[in-house]
């Protein structure tokens, strides 16, 4: 019978590898199942998680996974909840992200908890965070995040 390793303790080796990879800049987030990294998300911000949420295959990977991410705010938290991940480990996590995850039964851990996730200039709130600040429904939140990302990308091109 195959063991199902789901907690932080049972997955600590894979978590250590994921944290090292994120800190080295090799990837931005990782999904872990049974102490194995099953997915490394490349890209900035929430885009790697958002890409996963956009496909059936990606949602299957998220389901029951332990998500390790550089930054987990409410935006990432909504994707994690929609994908039915069971655990979220943020190198940095916002209070609103942590509260949202816990409200949906996702176990959380972080190296640092902050009041808010800043934008890339460090002078304001992240636009992805701002777009879902007042939302609670994960499916509607992820839809809003996809719209916001498309809008931000169209402005920068």
Segments from the language model and where they lie:
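C-terminal binding/interaction regions
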Residues: 5, 83-86, 96-157
């Amino acid at each position: 019978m195959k063991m199902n390793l789901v907690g932080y303790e049972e997955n600590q080796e894979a978590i250590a590898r994921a944290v090292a990879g994120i800190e080295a800049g090799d990837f931005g987030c990782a999904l872990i199942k049974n102490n194995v990294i099953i997915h490394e998300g490349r890209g900035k911000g929430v885009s790697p998680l958002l890409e996963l949420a956009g496909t059936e295959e990606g949602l299957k990977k998220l389901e029951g996974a332990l998500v390790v991410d550089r930054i987990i705010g409410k935006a990432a938290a909504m994707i994690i909840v929609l994908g039915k991940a069971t655990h979220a480990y943020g190198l940095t996590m916002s209070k609103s992200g942590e509260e949202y995850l816990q409200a949906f039964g996702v176990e959380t851990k972080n190296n640092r908890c902050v009041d808010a996730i800043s934008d890339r200039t460090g002078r304001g709130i992240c636009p992805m965070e701002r777009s879902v600040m007042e939302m609670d429904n994960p499916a509607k939140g992820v839809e809003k995040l996809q719209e916001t990302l498309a809008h931000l990308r169209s402005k920068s091109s």
